């Protein structure tokens, strides 16, 4: 009986570990998707452009300022230390790490079509963001 329990434990633990690893990589992607939806919605509701600043260690969502000197509220998400990402713009041939990239959402709801590659160790998830809906499209992944 003990042998059967040991076998079940050995078989069940690797899939559970795999799910935890995938969740650690999916969390920042879900946050980015939330930022994109919020930026699109707010841009259309307020009839002004919003931007998501894609920094090395975080994302910041804020309205695009027009030299008014005023400060607007913003949302921020800090990436976990072991997760990195790179982006590929429509005109790029390959992914590139950019220290301070801007992703602009116009008042008509459109955004620049970007492809993202998130990595954690040797695990990765790649996806494209639809410029009309700001939703994730064509996702590919490799999780050990």
Q: Which residue ranges define each predicted feature?
A:
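N-terminal helix-rich module
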Residues: 11, 15-34, 41, 45, ...
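Alpha-helical hydrophobic helix detector
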Residues: 1-14
């Amino acid at each position: 009986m003990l042998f059967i329990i040991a076998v079940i434990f050995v078989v069940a633990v690797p899939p559970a570990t795999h799910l935890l690893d995938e969740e650690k990589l999916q969390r920042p992607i879900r946050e980015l998707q939330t930022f994109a939806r919020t930026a699109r919605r707010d841009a259309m509701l307020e009839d002004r452009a919003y931007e998501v600043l894609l920094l090395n260690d975080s994302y910041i969502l804020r309205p695009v300022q027009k030299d008014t000197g005023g400060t607007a509220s913003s949302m921020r998400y800090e990436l976990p230390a072991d997760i990195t990402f790179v982006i590929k713009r429509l005109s790029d041939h390959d992914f590139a790490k950019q220290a301070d990239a801007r992703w602009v959402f116009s008042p008509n709801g459109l955004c620049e079509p970007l492809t993202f590659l998130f990595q954690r160790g040797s695990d990765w998830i790649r996806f494209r963001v639809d410029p009309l809906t700001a939703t994730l499209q064509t996702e590919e992944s490799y999780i050990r």
